[in-house]
């Protein structure tokens, strides 16, 4: 297995890895999103500003932006409908998740087209700087995992079960 295959595996794990089935522990974005009741999709926890809907749209939009700048024309803006297909409060949960899977798949297609040496090549980031390809992809992995935790926390606050089960 080459380096690109490893990167694809890690991107997939951060996005949709199942984690530990026996204890229902998962750190991936999509797996945490699947645990969300539809009544929580647009709900705000006390004192919160981010809904699970808005987090999901942000994660998908970041994938579109990184993909466009690293592998495409590098012209999209955060306000473009391709990046943000619904305004806040109007994204149907099932459609937003389907869109998220689609944009993740498009990114993976570009990564799979790379050879191992290309992981060291500089590519443009969506803020204009150039970074090694592997660095940009690492940011996307971390981004998925970070926001998976955020989804889990918002869901647990809304469900009133925000406590540690093991320690």
Model regions and ranges:
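Acidic/histidine-rich alpha-helical segments that form the ligand environment
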Residues: 85-124, 132-143
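Short, contiguous alpha-helical
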Residues: 1-33, 38-84, 124-167
């Amino acid at each position: 297995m080459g380096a690109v295959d490893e990167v694809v595996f890690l991107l997939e794990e951060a996005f949709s890895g199942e984690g530990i089935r026996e204890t229902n522990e998962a750190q991936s974005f999509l797996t945490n999103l699947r645990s969300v009741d539809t009544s929580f999709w647009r709900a705000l926890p006390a004192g919160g500003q981010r809904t699970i809907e808005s987090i999901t749209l942000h994660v998908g939009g970041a994938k579109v932006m990184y993909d466009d700048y690293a592998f495409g024309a590098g012209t999209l803006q955060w306000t473009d409908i391709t990046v943000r297909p619904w305004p806040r409060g109007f994204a149907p949960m099932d459609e937003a998740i389907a869109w998220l899977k689609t944009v993740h798949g498009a990114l993976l297609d570009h990564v799979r087209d790379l050879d191992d040496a290309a992981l060291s090549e500089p590519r443009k980031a969506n803020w204009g700087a150039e970074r090694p390809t592997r660095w940009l992809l690492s940011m996307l992995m971390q981004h998925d995992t970070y926001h998976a935790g955020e989804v889990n926390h918002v869901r647990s606050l809304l469900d009133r079960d925000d406590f540690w089960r093991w320690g």
